[in-house]
């Protein structure tokens, strides 16, 4: 049996099993993410939230998903049916594809490529096409306006996200997530991670992630009071479910990126405790909790405020930070905290 897995067919079976394992983890996590999001929102508003279907309401997300699947798929009159159906599938598949390079532990990754950050950034940039396709193919002005806003918002904040990530790359000398985590492995545990030397950028990165994933307070494309639910207004049944699933998977991906880039990934926060996948999942869950809390307690920004924040505040600040990190790494300021090439490169 062991010899079989050394053959091309056996290797293909192993790769397929690994792919299915990652997809299974993401999809099962998705059920709990939606449930947790609704529970946190309910707790802030002093409500109970989902509590009927299953124990503590844990099966509510499954029931909602089944409800969407069994409903009729309604295509608006005059819509481009092919593009209309292709848009949610594009968003969903691209959201899943980015997980191919996300490690959960040392060596636990589908594709351990040296340009993993560029891969994730490229996939994230492509996700705007699903939104544009959905808004344009609906043959309605409300989805189209929502898709245009979403495209402008996502492209604007990708610039600041990229510059913040460049600062981490300069410090590490690597675009591989394993190398970045290895560079944060120090004797001081939690205080060896990049959140400390890159402290201002952690906040900018988190806020940019909110804007990139269209989460409150930056949910301009889905502003019900202005755009009638934005680019999703004409969608129902399974296509709408795919859009929602893709959005939550992208949010979970941003939680994973925050953990890997600034908070040590699978590294233990306490020296002496073993590292492992538990820490990675715990950090991702914590950052999703922050996403949910921000959604529950913050009002929505106006569109002009959102654009001004991205172009006039985040972009100049992150650009200056890249220059600062470059000099700090070159001349090894602050005891070499910005120059860890030998550790992670």
From Swiss-Prot:
Q: GO terms for molecular function, please?
A: NADH dehydrogenase activity; oxidoreductase activity, acting on NAD(P)H, quinone or similar compound as acceptor; quinone binding
EC number(s) from the headed UniProt entry: 7.1.1.-
Q: What is this protein called?
A: NADH-quinone oxidoreductase subunit H
Respond yes or no to whether keyword Transmembrane is given for this record: yes
Q: Which GO terms describe its biological process?
A: aerobic respiration
Gene name per UniProt: nuoH
User: Which keywords label this protein?
Assistant: Cell inner membrane, Cell membrane, Membrane, NAD, Quinone, Translocase, Transmembrane, Transmembrane helix, Ubiquinone
Q: Membrane spanning segments where?
A: 13-33, 84-104, 115-135, 161-181, 190-210, 248-268, 277-297, 309-329
Q: Which family does it belong to?
A: Belongs to the complex I subunit 1 family.
What the protein does comes down to:
NDH-1 shuttles electrons from NADH, via FMN and iron-sulfur (Fe-S) centers, to quinones in the respiratory chain. The immediate electron acceptor for the enzyme in this species is believed to be ubiquinone. Couples the redox reaction to proton translocation (for every two electrons transferred, four hydrogen ions are translocated across the cytoplasmic membrane), and thus conserves the redox energy in a proton gradient. This subunit may bind ubiquinone.
Q: What is its main location?
A: membrane
Reaction(s) catalysed by this chain, per the record, are: a quinone + NADH + 5 H(+)(in) = a quinol + NAD(+) + 4 H(+)(out)
Protein localization = Cell inner membrane
Record's InterPro entries? NADH_UbQ_OxRdtase_su1/FPO, NADH_UbQ_OxRdtase_su1_CS
**Listed GO cellular component terms?**
plasma membrane
Topology versus the membrane: Multi-pass membrane protein
Q: Which organism is it from?
A: Roseobacter denitrificans (strain ATCC 33942 / OCh 114) (Erythrobacter sp. (strain OCh 114))
Q: How does it assemble?
A: NDH-1 is composed of 14 different subunits. Subunits NuoA, H, J, K, L, M, N constitute the membrane sector of the complex.
């Amino acid at each position: 049996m062991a010899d079989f897995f050394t053959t091309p067919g056996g290797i293909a079976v192993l790769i397929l099993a690994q792919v299915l394992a990652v997809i299974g983890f993401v999809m099962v996590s998705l059920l709990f993410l939606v449930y947790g999001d609704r529970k946190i929102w309910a707790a802030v508003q002093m409500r109970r939230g989902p509590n009927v279907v299953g124990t503590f309401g844990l099966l509510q997300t499954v029931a909602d998903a089944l409800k969407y699947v069994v409903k009729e798929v309604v295509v608006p009159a005059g819509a481009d049916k092919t593009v209309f159906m292709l848009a949610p599938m594009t968003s969903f598949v691209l959201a899943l594809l980015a997980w191919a390079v996300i490690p959960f532990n040392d060596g636990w990754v589908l594709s351990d490529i040296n340009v993993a950050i560029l891969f994730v950034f490229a996939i994230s940039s492509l996700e705007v096409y699903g939104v544009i396709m959905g808004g344009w193919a609906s043959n309605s002005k409300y989805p189209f306006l929502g898709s245009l806003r979403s495209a402008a918002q996502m492209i604007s904040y990708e610039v600041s996200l990229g510059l913040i990530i460049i600062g981490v790359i300069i410090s590490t000398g690597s675009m591989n997530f394993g190398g970045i985590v290895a560079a944060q492995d120090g004797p001081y545990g939690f205080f060896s991670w990049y959140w400390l030397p890159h402290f201002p950028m952690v906040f900018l990165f988190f806020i940019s992630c909110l804007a990139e994933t269209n989460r409150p307070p930056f949910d301009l494309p889905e502003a019900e009071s202005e755009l009638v639910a934005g680019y999703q207004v004409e969608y129902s049944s399974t296509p709408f479910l795919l859009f929602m699933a893709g959005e939550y998977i992208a949010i979970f991906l941003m939680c994973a990126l925050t953990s890997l880039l600034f908070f040590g990934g699978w590294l233990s926060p306490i020296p002496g405790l073993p590292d492992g996948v538990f820490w990675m999942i715990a950090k991702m869950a914590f950052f999703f909790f922050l996403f949910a809390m921000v959604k529950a307690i913050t009002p929505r920004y106006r569109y002009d405020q959102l654009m001004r924040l991205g172009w006039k505040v985040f972009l100049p600040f992150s650009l200056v930070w890249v220059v600062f990190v470059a000099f700090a790494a070159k001349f090894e300021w602050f005891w070499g905290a910005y120059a860890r090439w030998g550790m992670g490169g």
